Amino acid sequence: RVCQIGLFSLTLPMAVHAQSLPVIAQHPIKNVIKNLEQPTTQQTQQKTKQNKSIAQMRIMHIDLDYVFDTDKAQQQRNIQALIQRIQNIRPNTIFLQAFADPDANGSADQVYFENCYMPVRDNLFQQVLQQIRQNTQVQHVYAWLPVLAWELPKDQQLNYVQHRQGGQKGYIRLSPFEQKNLDIIVDIYRDFIQHNPVDGVLYHDDVTLSDYEDSSALAHKYYQQWGFSHRIFKDLRHPEQARLAKYKTAYLDQLAAGITQVLKQYKPNLLVARNMYAPVVPQPQSEQWFAQSMPSTYRYYDYNAIMAMPYMEQSKDHKKFYLDLIQHAKKYDPNLDRTIFELQTVN
């Protein structure tokens, strides 16, 4: 059953068990999964080798927007240059972008794989995946995909995350409280996994809601179901804000866990990682601003990919920034077996 505490049987540090994580009993992702057709034996990738975790992951995070070109001869040259770089750097793991973000706003305008909902910029993911498999030493390839940040064609007339001050701020994200949106998101993932035999999925850093979000009417209905009064929505300093944030975190992470459950129907040994904002690691109170937390992350994902980017966080002391992240991450993952630090190579 999705969204139950027993969804993943992981051995977690005491620091994780010590905190009570809410469970969203009536999560709509349950209905989405219940109504899905089960994959046939042919669709399930049974013959794929079992994914064994890599003791020391050496990762390249690749943005296909820089490989894509309308000139297909140039695009092939770009692919070959990428493969050569992978051969030179010798990573054992690749995080490979599967969505297109040409306007660089963090949301998917198009994708690099065939599907029924999003415009296809080019079926580039499959090409690059095949080249990596055939011509490099890489052991695992993860598809980097959004959970909420899908900008679908406007004629779909979908509901998006609303900011309390009006309109949309940050990434353009489908409201996670709308059943129709969840149906679409799951269908996009099903279209992807049936034709792209990846080892894992990296969930984008769009799995987040600020303390001003989601302010849509449907979101407010959920907040009331969780036991929060209208007063809390008008006062960001309300003492219940921290508890509301925990519920939003639980809702988002259990949504991602539901998607993972669907993917594993096709790829039983799939591994999943999530991008986490760095302030959440040393400052648990940041959960109110991001709806992300360390305990919930290690509950619902195989890996926590922390965006350890001091320039983005405007940190003056980069060494201290990194050491603080390591120290605090060890409170939840003592051996850092399930923690990834994504480093910023340029400002």
Stretches with model-predicted labels:
Residues 24, 28-39, 47-78, 346:
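Boundary/entry segment of secreted carbohydrate-active catalytic domains
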Residues 53-76, 140-191, 195, 238:
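Active-site-adjacent "subsite" loops/lids of carbohydrate-active enzymes
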Residues 62, 273-280, 329-347:
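Active-site clefts of carbohydrate-active enzymes
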Residues 77-103, 195-200, 297-304:
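Catalytic domains of carbohydrate-active enzymes, especially glycoside hydrolases
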Residues 81, 282-296, 318-331:
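Alpha-helical scaffolding within the catalytic cores
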Residues 82-83, 100-146, 240, 244-266:
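Aromatic-lined substrate-binding rim segments of carbohydrate-active enzymes
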Residues 85, 167-300, 306-312:
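Polysaccharide-binding and catalytic clefts of secreted carbohydrate-active enzymes
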Residues 93-95, 124-167, 202-208:
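Glycine-rich, aromatic-flanked loop segments that form ligand/cofactor-binding clefts
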